[in-house]
Amino acid sequence: MAGTDREKALDAALAQIERQFGKGAVMRMGDRTQEPIEVISTGSTALDIALGVGGLPRGRVVEIYGPESSGKTTLTLHAVANAQKAGGQVAFVDAEHALDPEYAKKLGVDIDNLILSQPDNGEQALEIVDMLVRSGALDLIVIDSVAALVPRAEIEGEMGDSHVGLQARLMSQALRKITSALNQSKTTAIFINQLREKIGVMFGSPETTTGGRALKFYASVRLDIRRIETLKDGTDAVGNRTRVKVVKNKVAPPFKQAEFDILYGQGISREGGLIDMGVEHGFVRKAGAWYTYEGDQLGQGKENARNFLKDNPDLADEIERKIKEKLGVGVRPDAAKAEAATDAAAAADTAGTDDAAKSVPAPASKTAKATKATAVKS
């Protein structure tokens, strides 16, 4: 009896909350539709797989940080290009005033439709971010970078003035405001951040990111990007080998790593990453310097194989799909079931056609000949 009274009291409270705050303000978790996490591809298959869900999750805060010239902006511009290719609207808040439109265009960004803001101070930048996110019309917004979000008081003050904690308070307030709006509008916010050294650290890493601790807490995904090797063509440097570590991940297991090539003037080499992943998972075979896929030669040396895949995008898509299917990343269960059902139906149709072919009567001419032969014998 007591249990029934408690259930009635709970139902009454839930009904009152819905009347006061609107439908969906509170619900039983089982009543929610379990939709797969929507993502934006990073441009690197290896990194999409390391993230566990096939890309950067929609409606979340993402932080990308690393040393100078490590590929932070390049990685972000690839995400911008992929969001636009999927029909999304993207905004870029260039607090550093350093975005190169020509380079962005080379990476596939539609600069004609990219919403760009170059604010004067940190308050203005984050106010613009808040207004754009609350419009509900964006799929992705990029802030480059947190370190360049200089508070108004610091800009208007003297050069030697101390402004301890101003930027951290600004970031904390902004993230409190926009996090809910990001989730409701399914907008991904990428904050690019820089590294600083903590003075007097004896043990552990002395590196830290700018903007206080708020971003560390509010970010669903944190990516640490580092340049690990210089790629050379003879004596000329043509790119960097880059490693990204998923330091924090609220949508999949963290601490996974991905490596890929960033080529100067071209960005992330998707085809090079597919070759590496294909060899690792047994889809692409390497014998000496030759790379082959299902008996077909891709080329001698990684560069030739990379160019072959670039010239044959359908083949590259096929290899990527097989890798993701094997690892169970980016494959929706309902889509997999639908595909299996379609395959089964196609197999049934084929079998029916074969049976029908077997029971087709002999042509009339042959039947006539057989009748004549029987008559002659008799």
UniProtKB/Swiss-Prot annotation:
- Please report the organism this UniProt entry assigns to the protein: Streptomyces venezuelae (strain ATCC 10712 / CBS 650.69 / DSM 40230 / JCM 4526 / NBRC 13096 / PD 04745)
Checking InterPro entries in the record gives:
AAA+_ATPase, DNA_recomb/repair_RecA, DNA_recomb/repair_RecA_CS, P-loop_NTPase, RecA-like_C, RecA-like_N, RecA_ATP-bd, RecA_C_sf
Q: Which GO molecular-function terms appear in the entry?
A: ATP binding; ATP hydrolysis activity; ATP-dependent DNA damage sensor activity; damaged DNA binding; single-stranded DNA binding
Task: Enumerate the residues binding ATP.
Answer: G66, P67, E68, S69, S70, G71, K72, T73
One GO cellular component term: cytosol
Task: Name the chain's protein.
Answer: Protein RecA
* Cellular compartment(s): Cytoplasm
CDD domains per UniProt? RecA (cd00983)
* Keyword Nucleotide-binding in record: yes
Low complexity: bias regions: 338-378
Which Gene Ontology BP annotations are present? DNA recombination; DNA repair; SOS response
Q: Which residue stretches belong to region Disordered?
A: 333-378
Q: Which UniProt keywords apply?
A: ATP-binding, Cytoplasm, DNA damage, DNA recombination, DNA repair, DNA-binding, Nucleotide-binding, SOS response
Known function: Can catalyze the hydrolysis of ATP in the presence of single-stranded DNA, the ATP-dependent uptake of single-stranded DNA by duplex DNA, and the ATP-dependent hybridization of homologous single-stranded DNAs. It interacts with LexA causing its activation and leading to its autocatalytic cleavage.
